[in-house]
Each structure stands twice: as C-alpha cells, then as structure tokens.
Regions:
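Iron-associated oxidoreductase/ferritin-like identity signal
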Residues: 1-163
Length: 163
C-alpha cells in the first residue's frame, strides 16, 4: 500500500497508537521496578511480561507504518501513573488499557467506515489483544480484591463510536 493511499486520519490513529503503546511500555517497566523494590517479585515479573507484550505491539505498529511508507513518530508520552499499592497500580493500568481499547475500537470502526479493510484488520487485531490484557488485569484485580469491575470482553460490542 502506498502512503498516498492511506487516509490521513488512519495515519493519525497509527501515530497515537504508537504513543499509547510506548506509554504502556514505560508504565509497566517502571511499575516492575517499583513493585520489585517493594519486595513483590511475582508482581514485578508480571509487569515485565506486560512490558514485553506492549513493546511487541509498538514494534508491530512501527513495522506497519514502515510498510505503508510512513516514518513512525510517536507524539508525547503520558507520564507514568503512580499509586501507593499494587491494587492502585493495577487500577491505573486498567485506565491505560481502557484508553488503548477505546482507541483501537474507534480506529477499526473508522477504517470500516472508509472501507480500509487492511488497516481495519490491523487495528481490530490490536483491539483483541488489548481486550485480552484488560480481562487479565480485571482477573488480577479480582484476585487482590480490587475495586474495579470492567467489561473488557464486551467493550465495543454494540457501541457506537463517533468518527
């Protein structure tokens, strides 16, 4: 696909996706170190695994952008979210995952609207991955008695997103 064939808004979605994924990498990496300092090595390892998964998403986005003939450029990263305990950190992560889910849902719907099947499928695959992450976070929060209950599996189904 040539760059001139890609809708400018799709390029915007890709750039924002890269920023959000790199924000997630930064957040999970920082939290892995933080909970390690707290002595919770099991949680630190889980955060390291999340870091790798989000880094893989960022790499997929970079590769996709390059395949479109676009130089990858993330915009500004969000600051790392802090909390005084593991449940608080997980709730902050759930908020970030929700941003990713909303973004990929909106991007895939826009691609459907303009009949861009290739980019729509790309965003839909990332959406599915992030919904899975969201369900994992929800389960971890429930294990710890967390306060949030989210419907990640159902997010985006039957919802209208303004495009």
């Amino acid at each position: 696909m040539q760059m001139d064939a890609v809708h400018p808004r799709v390029l915007g979605y890709l750039g924002r996706a890269l920023s959000l994924e790199l924000t997630a990498v930064q957040q999970y990496m920082t939290q892995a170190s933080l909970v390690g300092l707290w002595g919770d090595q099991a949680a630190a390892e889980r955060f390291r695994e999340e870091t790798v998964e989000e880094m893989e998403h960022a790499e997929r986005i970079v590769q996709h952008m390059l395949s479109l003939g676009v130089a990858p450029a993330a915009s500004q990263l969000q600051p790392v979210s802090h909390a005084p305990d593991l449940v608080g950190l997980l709730e902050k992560n759930a908020d970030l995952e929700q941003q990713l889910i909303r973004h990929y849902d909106e991007a895939s719907r826009f691609c459907q609207l303009i009949n861009d099947q290739a980019n729509g499928a790309f965003f839909a695959a990332l959406l599915e991955d992030e919904q899975h992450h969201g369900r994992e976070l929800e389960a971890w929060l429930q294990e710890l008695g967390g306060r949030r209950r989210r419907g990640y599996a159902r997010y985006g189904v039957g919802r209208r997103t303004t495009v």
